[in-house]
């Protein structure tokens, strides 16, 4: 029974590490997306300041602000998922080190 429990714990740990790797990759892409939106917004605002306000520019700036907000919201969701996975992994490791899951570490 202990061997089966150890194998299940090891499999679960492997699954969590893979999921964390995927979440971290999504986070990096999300940070790039947010940075791109920030740069585009800054350029649009500078252009508006230099060339003046126009309805088309105002609409573009509003769209860029929405994109930035969406990117930030997506990052918060990714960070929440990462926190959940990290906590689950820490709990699994804690149980393993306390001896309740055998000695596979």
Predicted feature residues:
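Short, flexible coil/linker elements and helix-boundary hinge sites characteristic
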Residues: 52, 69, 94-95
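Extended alpha-helical coiled-coil "stalk/arm" regions
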Residues: 27-63
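Short, charged, intrinsically disordered terminal tails
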Residues: 2-11, 86-105
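Alpha-helical coiled-coil oligomerization motifs
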Residues: 35, 42, 49, 76, ...
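Short, charge/polar-rich alpha-helical segments
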Residues: 2-36, 69
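Non-transmembrane, elongated alpha-helical coiled-coil stalk/scaffold segments that mediate dimerization
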Residues: 7, 14, 21-22, 43, ...
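Amphipathic alpha-helical coiled-coil segments
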Residues: 27, 60-90
């Amino acid at each position: 029974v202990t061997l089966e429990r150890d194998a299940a714990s090891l499999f679960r740990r492997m699954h969590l590490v893979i999921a964390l790797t995927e979440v971290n990759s999504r986070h990096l892409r999300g940070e790039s997306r947010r940075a791109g939106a920030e740069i585009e917004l800054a350029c649009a605002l500078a252009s508006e300041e230099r060339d003046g306000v126009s309805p088309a520019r105002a609409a573009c700036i509003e769209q860029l602000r929405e994109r930035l907000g969406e990117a930030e919201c997506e990052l918060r969701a990714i960070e929440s998922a990462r926190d959940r996975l990290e906590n689950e992994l820490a709990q699994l490791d804690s149980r393993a080190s306390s001896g309740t899951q055998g000695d596979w570490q």
